[in-house]
From Swiss-Prot:
It comes from the Eukaryota. Pfam families: Aldolase_II, Hydrolase. This is Probable bifunctional methylthioribulose-1-phosphate dehydratase/enolase-phosphatase E1 1. Mg(2+) binds at D281, E283, D476.
Length: 517
């Protein structure tokens, strides 16, 4: 009965009569009014930028509400209600504007449509704004290597959902592409990686901002642009907007902390390498190996059945199952010990889950570094961290070192066999609080095996250095050290309690604490 009622609701909401109803027409008019207003602010000039709003109707659940969207490549200040597109909740066109005479171009829906849909689907947004405001573009250029914009202790931060005056506002930055639609995957990854954010900056381009309603989205957009403008002005004054006191930007080697740190002189008066980036391993480097083997792995193993049963119908878990099926089929063909066939979907949920659990337990027992396992483990751990069943552990010297490197303008990345999601969780929920603010990015085995030189070549090409020697890689595994050195990276081996032995005469510098770096 409930399904039938929902289907009836969907049909009624997409009927021609409803498309001509007051809620839809009011939303069309509101959108055209906002286009003119935002044009005056410089957010949608030169036909750039776009806006979309869901048709608010108390009788229709938000996920089923229709979507009104502005067109692309048009003069936003001249928009009228009839120029707007109306889309279904899934993004199908229900109503399109009529062509206008020359010199107007044929109507075309916003190129931002796929990105707007991500905000609707992933954040249940009520409205999304894409601005080309000058301040949202320039603020991404101040530090070309930064993956985030950060600001704190500014009154207007209070206008951003979930933030107060004393909080640090963090906005992810993704790289621009030649075509708007090519940003879709990067935007989705940023939304997933930053669950608290209500905006994503696009370098040298602009910003996407969403809210529960058009008022909420508009209010936040005004606050974001104010904060970006403030950061730019503070930077021009030589003041640091990212610190509570907004004091002078610190300088290292004649450069500000917005730049990279120059080579330093050690206690023997020898010039050490100029490090622009530090790439850190996790197990045995930032975190005790025992935490992974004694806490994380058992948690995943003990909760895999519960997790699969509770989330079986979700798209995320179905993707996990698809990856596991592919991996298990390969394992069976290669005769991998512990691999058992997974029944087809029509065999029943319980049978499929039982086979999946058997395979996952065998993979964990063998400590296999494979994407299918790591991805599922990450999703299980996410639930544990969010429910306070898990807390990440790092060595006591790690937070201070990360803070020091961050202040020095050195970019710090993580490279681990664990999934990027698992890495973000570990550093986001540590015994020292959220340390992700000191990290610029995460690499996992999708970039390559950690014992292969080409993986470190790929990382070198991804972090924006001029040469591999500007990267310091810290690991506890000799084979990884050899591979990184072969790629031209500077390498240090971490000696921590519980780490495995190293070969005699291995030839690498070693440390027992990050304070030694």
């Amino acid at each position: 009965m409930a399904a039938a009622a929902l289907n009836g609701l969907k049909m009624a909401a997409t009927s021609q009569a409803y498309l001509e109803s007051m809620p839809v027409n009011d939303t069309r008019k509101l959108l055209s009014d906002l286009c003119r207003h935002f044009y005056g602010l410089g957010w949608v000039s030169g036909t750039g930028g776009s806006i979309t709003i869901k048709v608010h109707d108390e009788s229709i659940p938000k996920p089923q509400q229709l979507i009104v969207m502005s067109p692309s490549g048009v003069q936003k200040e001249r928009m009228v209600p009839e120029d707007m597109y109306v889309l279904s909740p899934s993004g199908c066109f229900l109503s399109s504007p009529s062509p206008k005479p020359y010199p107007n171009k044929p109507p075309k829906c916003s190129d931002c449509a796929p990105l707007f849909m991500k905000a609707y689907l992933m954040r249940n947004a009520g409205a999304v704004i894409h601005s080309h405001g000058m301040e949202s573009c320039i603020v991404t250029m101040i530090d070309p290597l930064s993956k985030e914009f950060r600001i704190t202790h500014m009154e207007m931060i209070k206008g951003i959902q979930g933030h107060g005056y004393y909080d640090e506002l963090v906005v992810p930055i993704i790289e621009n592409t030649a075509h708007e639609r090519e940003l879709t995957d990067a935007l989705a990854e940023a939304i997933e990686a930053y669950p608290k954010t209500t905006a994503v900056l696009v370098r040298n381009h602009g910003i996407y901002i969403w809210g529960d309603s058009w008022i909420h989205a508009k209010t936040q957009a005004e606050c974001y642009h104010y904060l970006f403008d403030a950061a730019i002005k503070l930077y021009q004054l030589g003041l640091d907007w990212s610190t509570p006191d907004h004091g002078p930007i610190k300088k290292y080697g004649g450069k500000t902390n917005m730049s990279v740190k120059a080579g330093t002189v050690n206690s023997n008066h020898e010039t050490e390498p100029s490090r622009r980036c530090i790439v850190l391993d996790i197990e045995g480097t930032t975190t005790p190996i025992s935490f992974v083997t004694d806490v994380l792995f058992p948690f995943a193993r003990n909760n895999v059945s519960r997790h699969l049963a509770a989330t079986y119908e979700t798209d995320e878990t179905q993707d996990d199952i698809k990856l596991l099926r592919t991996q298990v089929q390969s394992d069976l063909e290669q005769g991998i010990v512990g691999a058992v066939p997974i029944p087809p979907d029509d065999a029943g949920k319980e049978e499929v889950i039982a086979a999946l659990v058997a395979n996952v337990e065998a993979m964990i027992k063998a400590d296999r570094k494979i994407t299918a396992l790591k991805q599922l483990q990450g999703h299980i751990w996410r639930t544990g961290f969010q429910n306070n069943e898990l807390e990440g552990v790092v060595f006591e010297d790690v937070p201070e070192a990360l803070q020091k490197w961050h202040a020095s303008g050195i970019k710090v990345y993580i490279y681990s066999s664990g999934s990027r999601l698992a890495q973000r969780l570990l550093f986001g929920y540590t015994n020292y609080g959220d340390l992700r603010k000191y990290l610029c990015g995460f690499f996992d085995t999708t970039v390559g095996n950690k014992r292969e030189t080409k993986s470190y070549v790929e990382i070198t090409e991804s972090v924006g250095v001029d040469k591999p020697s500007e990267i310091l890689f810290v690991t506890d595994v000799y084979q990884e050290a050899v591979a990184a050195k072969a790629a031209g990276l500077e390498v240090i081996i971490s000696i921590r309690p519980g780490n495995g032995p190293l070969p005699d005469n291995h030839g690498f510098k070693t440390i027992t604490s990050f304070s030694d770096i």
